[in-house]
Amino acid sequence: MVCALVCEDLARPDPVANIVRAVGPNLVIALLMDGPQTKERWAARYATVLADDPGCSVLSLTSLGMAQLSSPKAPPSRSRVVALWKDRFNGATEIEVPPGAVAIAVSLSTRYDEEFTADGRGDGGKAAFPILSGMHPITAAARAQTR
């Protein structure tokens, strides 16, 4: 199950976090109008909470244009980090649009793991969790070829 959040839903965890925990989605996608999605910023902290409890995968993303509006006081510029992926198995992964590319596509795979009920019954490893399996830059030349 996928749960979509917009900027304010992620920024203000109450009451949204309670609803997300009650639903228990496998994947949360947070669409943000924000700066670069680096591990140090606020979105990463809130995404980590959702990835840990209820244990879903979280993708927070912003547009390349919004990320490039960022003007950090000290180098290096991280203005091409447009997304952050976090799941229950791996640490946070910054997703950056490389120079020369206009976008980036992500590939997801499914990892199966066992979950248990409150009384100790397992599901036999049938619980599916999306995990990040690849990042693929899209260049303007590749985009022109598809038209």
Predicted region positions:
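CN hydrolase (nitrilase-like) catalytic-core segments centered on the catalytic cysteine
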Residues: 7-122
